[in-house]
A protein has these predicted regions:
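Short glycine-enriched, charge-decorated loop/helix-capping segments at active-site entrances
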Residues: 75-83, 178-180, 209
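Short, hydrophobic/glycine-enriched beta-strand segments
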Residues: 57-65
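Amphipathic, non-transmembrane alpha-helical scaffold segments
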Residues: 85, 89, 112, 184, ...
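Short glycine/proline- and acidic residue-enriched helix-loop micro-motifs
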Residues: 191-211
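GST-like fold's C-terminal all-alpha helical module
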Residues: 211-240
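Short catalytic helix/loop segments, enriched in acidic residues and glycine
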Residues: 78-96
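Phosphate-coordination/substrate-recognition cap region in phosphate-metabolizing enzymes
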Residues: 4, 10-11, 37, 42, ...
Length: 240
């Protein structure tokens, strides 16, 4: 099932050209407090001991985007920015109901609309009633000013959405836009299966699973884990 939530507890500097760091984008948006530790973290650290690092007690929610219009047509989608289908919207609502009582402080999504919209729709079901807002991460000063929330009170009811290409779906290269069944007929089922499921073999002009995993892991270790360590509850809305 798409847009389902997987709950887990505890536990790169951004390389996007023209993008500021997540910390800087938080400050620019008027959300400085997200760069601090969560309210319960200090007490947890004081109680920690031994060789193991203390747990932050933070939640991590992993969510796959709802069905896209190309999923519905059995097309290779990859990094093409295809919207959700009607079914995908309903799946996002259903996923939101499943995590309605799980605390969420910050959301990470890919740069693709289907992952962002899934997260935004899901959060409309959340018990907190907080508003998910996409952060502007560019360097244009006018755009930074225009996108800033100037009310500190309102800012504390915002759940920031951080977009990054490092969480994008695997790039399928020259397969993108083609029907999966038709590609199997023209290139052979074994070859297409290898392109899709081999860890090291990439489709023509695309990414292997190994390449995809490297960029995702680097982003998680350098950006997501520090948020969890600060005690912030994180949701990632991305791809399978």
């Amino acid at each position: 099932m798409r847009a389902t939530a997987i709950l887990e507890a505890d536990r790169l500097i951004d390389t996007e050209l023209g993008c500021v760091s997540i910390e800087e984008s938080m400050r620019s948006a008027g959300l400085d407090f997200y760069n601090e530790s969560g309210p319960g973290l200090d007490g947890v650290i004081k109680e920690g001991g031994g060789d193991e690092p203390p747990s932050s007690g933070a939640h991590l929610v992993l969510m796959r985007h709802g069905e896209s219009m190309w999923n519905d047509r059995n097309l290779f989608t990859g990094c093409v920015d295809v919207p959700l289908s009607k079914k995908g919207v309903q799946e996002a609502i259903a996923a939101g109901k499943r995590i309605a009582n799980v605390p969420v402080d910050v959301i990470f999504t890919s740069a693709l609309a289907r992952s962002q919209v899934t997260a935004q729709i899901a959060m409309t079901e959340h018990i907190s009633s907080k508003v998910p807002v996409v952060l502007y991460r560019g360097t244009d000063e006018r755009a930074i000013y225009w996108s800033r929330c100037h009310s500190e009170e309102t800012a504390r009811d915002i759940i920031p959405i951080v977009r990054t290409w490092q969480l994008n779906e695997r790039m399928y290269g020259r397969l993108q836009g083609y029907n999966k069944a038709e590609m199997a007929e023209s290139h052979g089922e074994e070859k297409v299966f290898e392109w899709r499921r081999s860890y090291e073999t990439a489709p023509p002009g695309g990414e292997s699973l190994e390449m995809t995993g490297r960029r995702v892991q680097a982003f998680f270790l350098n950006e997501v884990e520090p948020m969890l360590a600060k005690g912030h509850n994180v949701m990632i809305s991305a791809h399978a």
